[in-house]
């Protein structure tokens, strides 16, 4: 990837207006709302109210898993999402039916290699791929297997202010995505951690 390009930064698992506005003002490029089953799940109605209060130029992303495509499109339209992040077994055909840009979640296992990751990505025509060892797992994966992948990849899973510089220097990804690594508790962000995380990313 282009090492001169500014790394995109998403704070995921937003559940309240205060956190959404604060992380936006601290410099996040995007914020994520989880509509799949999760301890950070949010209702479309609540997400819509939060998005209406956001400052301009913040990308809003909805996280879904194996939902009916018409349901995803309906929520995306109602909430005014900019993109959808699909973390299930959604097929390329399914992704092509989305009325928003798609970030396809790629589950990274301990048995994966660079070749197997590329195999999982083939046949998809999406805006980006997010490599994650499991939604909200708080664990990292072996970053070495993603070295040299010439696709727009976003790294997630176990990221924190302490390790995000390492993964950026190793992979030069399109973006990084953090949730539990900047939380006080499920669904509530620790702004000191958020600020430090963003500072670390921007210093790369």
Over which residues does each language-model region extend?
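Conserved N-terminal beta1-alpha1 strand-loop-helix module at the mouth
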Residues: 1-131, 136-204
């Amino acid at each position: 990837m282009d090492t001169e390009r500014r790394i995109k930064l998403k704070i995921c698992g937003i559940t309240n207006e205060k956190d959404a506005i604060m992380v936006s003002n601290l410099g996040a490029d995007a914020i994520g709302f989880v509509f799949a089953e999760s301890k950070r799940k949010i209702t479309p109605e609540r997400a819509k109210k939060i998005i209406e209060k956001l400052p301009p130029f913040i990308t809003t992303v909805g996280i879904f898993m194996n939902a009916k495509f018409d349901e995803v499109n309906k929520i995306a339209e109602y909430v005014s999402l900019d993109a959808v992040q699909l973390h299930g077994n959604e097929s390329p055909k399914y992704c092509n039916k989305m009325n928003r840009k798609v970030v396809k979640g790629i589950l990274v296992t301990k048995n994966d290699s660079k070749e197997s990751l590329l195999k999982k990505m083939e046949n998809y025509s999406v805006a980006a791929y997010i490599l994650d060892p499991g939604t909200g797992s708080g664990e990292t994966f072996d970053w070495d297997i993603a070295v040299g992948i010439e696709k727009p990849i976003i790294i997630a899973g176990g990221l924190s202010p302490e390790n995000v510089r390492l993964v950026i220097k190793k992979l030069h990804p399109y973006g990084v995505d953090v949730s539990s690594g900047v939380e006080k508790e499920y669904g509530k962000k620790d702004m000191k951690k958020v600020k430090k995380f963003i500072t670390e990313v921007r210093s790369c």
